[in-house]
Amino acid sequence: MRLPAEALKDARKIVCFSGAGISAESGILTYLDQMPKLWAPYDPRALETANAFRESPALVWGWYLWRRRQVDRAQPNAAHLVWPQMVNLGYEVSVVTQNVDDLHERAGSTDVIHLHGSLTMPKCFACHRPAELTSDQMEIPDEGALVEPPRCKRCRGKLRPGVVWYGEDLPPGTWKNAVSLVKNCDALISVGTSGVVTPAADLPHIALASGATVIHVNTVDVGAQAANELMLVGRATDVLAKIHESLSTGKNNDNG
């Protein structure tokens, strides 16, 4: 890991840009994994649209309740924990994630930017007002179930997940904040993202264009073509642990 450690040696501002691969090691299913029987006939992406919710609200709401329970039972892994540890080394670390779970926050990262929203923050499908669920409204069997969405206390519209569905735009303020962080970082470390979902996939390119070093961490080679771009193939927990170890050693040597 000498090369990435050397690339990060003079960095002060680091952006973690994370995707599904970082949470997969905590047991969070990805689109490639087998779904529970109730939803097995469906492509998960087909359930993540406003039209799907209009046509089958109980199917879609039940799907998201099951996913939320899956996240609640999961624990942050070493790849989530490394970012607060890097803060302790003196780096200014920001997290921009495509994930809708809260594992970064539970690992100790603060002010996480969720490009695609969050499972923990439902809202009204009609008036878009944020809502909170009671514990009984979050109950769902292990095998999943069709569940009619609760109603908004304000307008009686159906509650929907507070995530960005396919065909919907990212919240302008969220995207603006993410781009600002990326344009001003010294290094961007992309972890577990395929780099195909736009506009999120543009962030590494924005970082490169702004002169930052970009390090890709993935179980498959997603390509690194620019002079200031590195590709590290491996599990996020393993690769990031080695990077952190190298940086810690470097800091200790500098202080010694």
From Swiss-Prot:
Organism, scientific name: Pseudomonas syringae pv. tomato (strain ATCC BAA-871 / DC3000)
Enzyme superclass (EC): transferase
SUPFAM superfamilies on file: DHS-like NAD/FAD-binding domain
Catalytic reaction equation(s): N(6)-acetyl-L-lysyl-[protein] + NAD(+) + H2O = 2''-O-acetyl-ADP-D-ribose + nicotinamide + L-lysyl-[protein]; N(6)-succinyl-L-lysyl-[protein] + NAD(+) + H2O = 2''-O-succinyl-ADP-D-ribose + nicotinamide + L-lysyl-[protein]
Comment, domains: 2 residues (Tyr-64 and Arg-67) present in a large hydrophobic pocket are probably involved in substrate specificity. They are important for desuccinylation activity, but dispensable for deacetylation activity.
Catalytic center residues: 116 (proton acceptor)
HAMAP family per the UniProt record, alphabetical: Sirtuin_ClassIII
Keywords: Cytoplasm, Metal-binding, NAD, Transferase, Zinc
Annotated function: NAD-dependent lysine deacetylase and desuccinylase that specifically removes acetyl and succinyl groups on target proteins. Modulates the activities of several proteins which are inactive in their acylated form.
Name by which UniProt lists this protein: NAD-dependent protein deacylase 4
Major localization listed first in the record, in broad terms: cytoplasm
Cofactor binding note: Binds 1 zinc ion per subunit.
Pfam families registered for this protein in UniProt: SIR2
UniProt EC number: 2.3.1.286
Residues annotated as binding substrate: 64, 67
Binding annotation for NAD(+): 19-39, 98-101, 192-194, 218-220, 236
Needed cofactors: Zn(2+)
Keyword Ribonucleoprotein found: no
